[in-house]
């Protein structure tokens, strides 16, 4: 079993260097991956948690971490794909894959915040089709020596696109979400499945559904990565009203933490991302260290 940890770009840490320091720390502690999240505005549950404190850009954060780490996978959990032009995003992430020596994984989702879609001028009703098409465009650019693509949104022929990513045929895309649409997307297009906040029971059920759909589509599920992101309670209780309705792992009792992780392992999770639910840098450091030294070795 592999373990990742979130770098708190989304927790309002006002000294950005304090947030960035958790990337090298995660690597030194033996974590397999570091992850960042994606939102544009402090609205809804984010405002409830941060007020006006900073939420840093995910790709800028990963770019910095690519230079301060050498081993850990660099992931997004998740990038809201409809917010990003796929041609520009393919270029950025391929460059980042080169800079990092092939360590980029894109966890992607369709998005859920109406205000952000409105601010970008993107119809929220098109978010699913946009997500699917963005995946196709990026893979065409990453993998084809002379990429071509035609749709009502994007049109190009016989272009020369560089750099190609280190990882071939393309950067891995792990599909986030557990909705029916996300399940179909993971089965048909995902290199992995990476939902957040689902219980072990739901994970096992949805995993079986994805495997069945993928096999029906002629895909080899043995090549898929089964991942999940779960909030770890740095202090007892959820971080927001939204988090209260989602599955969480206790962080104040390491025996219970291990039992919760075992349940995800038994449900079929291979790469578990631990999202520490605090902006208190001292508590983040303490919890990262205790998990790495006392809990994670039980699952290696």
Task: Give the predicted meaning of each segment.
Residues 44-49, 76, 82-189, 204-223:
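Internal, glycine-rich beta/alpha segment that forms the wall or movable "lid"
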Residues 28, 32, 125-167, 196-300:
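An alpha-helical appendage that flanks or caps ligand/catalytic pockets
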Residues 14-26, 89-92, 175-185, 250-263:
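Short, acidic/polar
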Residues 68-71, 100, 187-193, 268-270:
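Glycine-enriched alpha-helix->loop->beta-strand junction motifs that scaffold or abut catalytic
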Residues 8-10, 39-41, 79-81, 109-113, ...:
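Active-site beta-loop-alpha junctions enriched in small/polar residues
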Residues 5-16, 79-87, 169-178, 241-255:
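Active-site mouth loops of central-metabolism enzymes
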Residues 1-68, 169-171, 275-290, 299:
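N-terminal beta1-alpha1-beta2 module of alpha/beta enzyme domains
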Residues 3-7, 34-36, 74-76, 104-108, ...:
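Hydrophobic faces of well-ordered beta-strands that scaffold small-molecule active sites
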């Amino acid at each position: 079993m592999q373990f990742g940890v979130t770098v708190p770009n989304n927790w309002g840490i006002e000294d950005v260097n304090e947030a960035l320091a958790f990337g090298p720390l995660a690597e030194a502690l033996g974590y397999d991956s570091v992850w960042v999240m994606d939102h544009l505005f402090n609205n809804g549950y984010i405002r409830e948690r941060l007020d006006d404190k900073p939420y840093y850009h995910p790709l800028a954060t990963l770019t910095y971490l690519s230079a301060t780490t050498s081993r850990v996978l660099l992931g997004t959990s998740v990038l809201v794909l409809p917010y990003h032009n796929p041609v520009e995003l393919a270029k950025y992430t391929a460059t980042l894959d080169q800079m990092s020596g092939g360590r980029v994984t894109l966890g992607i989702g369709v998005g859920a915040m109406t205000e952000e879609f409105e601010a970008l001028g993107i119809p929220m009703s098109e978010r699913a089709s946009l997500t699917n098409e963005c995946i196709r465009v990026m893979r065409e650019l990453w993998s084809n020596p002379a990429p071509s693509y035609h749709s009502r949104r994007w049109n190009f022929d016989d272009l020369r696109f560089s750099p190609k990513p280190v990882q071939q045929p393309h950067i891995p895309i792990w599909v986030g979400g557990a909705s029916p649409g996300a399940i179909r997307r993971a089965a048909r297009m995902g290199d992995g499945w990476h939902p957040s906040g689902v219980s072990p029971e739901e994970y096992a059920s949805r995993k079986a559904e994805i495997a069945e759909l993928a096999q029906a589509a002629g895909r080899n599920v043995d090549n898929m990565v089964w991942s999940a992101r779960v909030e770890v309670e740095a202090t007892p209780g959820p971080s927001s009203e939204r988090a209260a309705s989602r599955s969480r792992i206790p962080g104040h009792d390491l025996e219970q933490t291990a039992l919760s992780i075992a349940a995800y392992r038994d449900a079929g999770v291979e790469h578990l991302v631990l999202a520490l639910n605090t902006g208190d840098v001292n508590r983040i450091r303490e919890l990262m260290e205790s998990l790495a030294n006392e809990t994670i070795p039980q699952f290696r």
